[in-house]
From Swiss-Prot:
Segments of this protein annotated with the region Disordered: 148-183
Keywords: Coiled coil, Nucleus, rRNA processing
Keyword Cytoplasm: no
Biased composition (Polar residues): 158-173
GO cellular component annotations of the record: cytoplasm; nucleolus; nucleus
An example Gene Ontology biological process: maturation of SSU-rRNA from tricistronic rRNA transcript (SSU-rRNA, 5.8S rRNA, LSU-rRNA)
Coiled-coil spans in chain: 33-94
Task performed by this protein: Involved in rRNA processing.
Family named by the database record: Belongs to the EFG1 family.
Species this protein is from: Schizosaccharomyces pombe (strain 972 / ATCC 24843)
Residues that span the membrane, as ranges: none
Protein name, entry field: rRNA-processing protein efg1
Length: 183
C-alpha cells in the first residue's frame, strides 16, 4: 500500500494550532479573520482525512502477512479445483461438489481481497477462535457471498485501497453549475 501523500499529521496539527492562536486575537481585520477561518476548516478536513489514511495504513501493515498467506491458500485451492473440473471422467455428483467448493473458495478470495479497510482483519482459516470472532467472520463472509451472488464488487474499498469513498453528485444535463458560483 503506497504511503499517504501530503503533509503529515504533526504538520497539519501545527498549522491548525497556529490558525487558532491567530483567530483568538480580538483586533484582527474581518477579511483576514474570514480567510483564516476558511483555512482552518480546510486544515481540519485534511487532518481528518490524513488520520483516516494513517489508520488504514496501520491496519493494512499489521495484517499484510496473514492476508497474503490466506490469499495464496485460496488461490491454490481454486487452481486445484479448476484442474479437477477439467477432468471429464468425473461423475455428476463429484462435479457438483467441486463446483460448490469452487464457489466457496471464490467467496473466500473475495473476503480476503475486499475486507473492510478500517476494521481489524479476522482470519478465515484460524482455528479455536471466540464466538465474537466467529460471528464477525460469518457476518462479513455472508456479506461477501451476497455481493458475489449479485455480481457487485467494491462496495467497500479493499484494504489495499488508498482512497476514501466519495459521494458523487448526480449530474444531469443542466446541473453543471458549481456551488461556488451560486453564492
Amino acid at each position: 500500500m503506497p504511503k499517504f501523500k501530503g503533509p503529515g499529521l504533526s504538520v497539519l496539527k501545527k498549522k491548525i494550532r497556529d490558525n487558532e492562536r491567530l483567530l483568538k486575537k480580538e483586533n484582527l481585520p474581518a477579511n483576514i479573520r474570514v480567510e483564516h477561518e476558511r483555512a482552518l476548516l480546510g486544515l481540519q478536513e485534511q487532518l481528518s482525512m490524513a488520520q483516516l489514511e494513517h489508520k488504514k495504513q496501520k491496519i493494512f501493515e499489521r495484517y499484510k502477512k496473514v492476508r497474503f498467506f490466506e490469499r495464496k491458500k485460496a488461490e491454490r485451492r481454486i487452481k486445484q479445483l479448476e484442474k479437477s473440473l477439467k477432468d471429464e471422467t468425473m461423475d455428476d455428483e463429484k462435479r457438483k461438489q467441486c463446483e460448490k467448493s469452487m464457489r466457496k473458495c471464490q467467496i473466500d478470495l473475495m473476503y480476503i481481497k475486499e475486507y473492510p479497510p478500517l476494521t481489524k482483519y479476522v482470519s478465515l482459516y484460524a482455528e479455536g477462535t471466540s464466538e465474537q470472532t466467529e460471528e464477525t467472520r460469518n457476518r462479513i463472509w455472508a456479506e461477501m457471498e451476497e455481493r458475489f451472488n449479485s455480481g457487485r464488487k467494491h462496495k467497500i474499498p479493499s484494504s489495499g485501497s488508498n482512497r476514501v469513498p466519495v459521494q458523487e453528485k448526480s449530474s444531469t444535463g443542466g446541473d453543471l453549475e458549481d456551488e461556488f458560483l451560486q453564492r
